[in-house]
Amino acid sequence: MINNGKALNNKKSIDYSKLFRHQAKFVAGAIHINQIPDFSLPEIVFVGKSNVGKSSIINTICNNKSLAKVSNTPGRTRQINFFNIVDKLIIVDLPGYGFANVPISVKEQWEGLITYYLRNSHNLMLVNLLIDSRRGIKENDKKVAELLLANKREFQIIFTKSDKVTDRENLNYEAQNFLATLNYLCNVIYVSSRNKEGMRELKASFAQCIKHQR
């Protein structure tokens, strides 16, 4: 497990598996690196390609349907969004990557913001690399995984929109090969915001990760 080298708020033992019974609230947004806040709380991060379903998953996990804005238009999330769960845990929603229909300068700004945060956050405990189960693992996903490993960030693969895929054998094989090339072992979880598949496992993985790292 990774120790990011900063003491976090740990006045008493917290049962993180029960935190998600509480609604989260939006507390900050960052468009530039100098706007990134430091809450000195554990951070669980969601990153993935544009329109992968990040907002829907975050809303489902955080028990708040209107928390993160859901859109069918790729590139809707244009800043890093921070959501606070009863001053015990921060959920972080990063802008989607790989969206081409924006000016190059804007795309470079998003990528720079994402990269800076992933490299420099002292409170980051776990990164959820979200991948559309209908599309499989793409080159952009591989680059993000390599960035995470280069910066010693713990991550797990989350296949989203699992209700739309019936045959998972090829996906499992693809994920295993992908992780083997990285020489990395992690959770692979299928989730759906529609039928709630995988939500319990996802929350449990957060609690387990934080427990081991603190």
UniProtKB/Swiss-Prot annotation:
Chain positions recorded as GTP binding sites: 48-55, 75-79, 93-96, 160-163, 191-193
Gene it is expressed from: engB
Protein keywords: Cell cycle, Cell division, GTP-binding, Magnesium, Metal-binding, Nucleotide-binding, Septation
Pfam family of the protein (one): MMR_HSR1
Similarity remark: Belongs to the TRAFAC class TrmE-Era-EngA-EngB-Septin-like GTPase superfamily. EngB GTPase family.
Protein origin, superkingdom: Bacteria
Gene3D superfamilies, sorted: P-loop containing nucleotide triphosphate hydrolases
Protein name in the entry: Probable GTP-binding protein EngB
